[in-house]
Amino acid sequence: MLLHIPAIFTAEEVSRIRAALEQAEWADGKATAGYQSAKAKHNLQLPQDHPLAREIGEAMLQRLWNHPLFMSAALPLKVFPPLFNCYTGGGSFDFHIDNAVRDVHGGRERVRTDLSSTLFFSDPEDYDGGELVIQDTYGLQQVKLPAGDLVLYPGTSLHKVNPVTRGARYASFFWTQSLVREDSQRTLLFEMDQSIQRLTRDVPDHPSLIRLTGTYHNLLRRWSEL
């Protein structure tokens, strides 16, 4: 499942965040890549312990944990602290699959990367190229969203970032360990939950709603891992 979640941040908030990112000191993005990925990765990255990364990352997670669409689709158990990158001057990241497990807090905790997310802090007209290209069931999907918007997709997906030939592309990316490991099961639960919400709005007193809601929770109980 590939899902576009709009307006995590407002235009005014994005403008302030991007201004701060533009003034930050960036490092070589290869530092956080695995052995194979490092050979394909050509970008800049904000150090993970940078105060700005922590500040914006905490604000992002607070928004997302209170966002009904993200919660419904991701069913998050744990989230890897958001990272921040910049592509400019031909920077790119060739096709790769993210590492299956990420260490957090110096290895004291681990996060399984069931879902990948990218939150854009540059508008499409601010740069040329830089599309996030994701290979899914329906072929190659090119993603280039407005600043403040997020795309959520399975961590198992082969993906790349096309070269940025003009301007700069600022974004954040992170991984989520879901209560439900399998993408097909998460997709089914998401579709059920969205249907339940629509029916609750349109026919709130329909007796089948209780049964359908019960079925959703029984499936979640069967498939969830804690």
UniProtKB/Swiss-Prot annotation:
Enzyme class: oxidoreductase
MF annotations from Gene Ontology: 2-oxoglutarate-dependent dioxygenase activity; iron ion binding; L-ascorbic acid binding
Free-text comment on the cofactor: Binds 1 Fe(2+) ion per subunit.
Binding site for 2-oxoglutarate: 169
EC number: 1.14.11.-
UniProt keyword Oxidoreductase, yes or no: yes
Keyword entries, A-Z: Dioxygenase, Iron, Metal-binding, Oxidoreductase, Vitamin C
GO biological process, one term: cellular response to iron ion
Residue stretches making up the Fe2OG dioxygenase domain: 78-178
Cofactor(s), by name: Fe(2+); L-ascorbate
Binding of Fe cation, residues: 96, 98, 159
Record-given protein name: PKHD-type hydroxylase PiuC
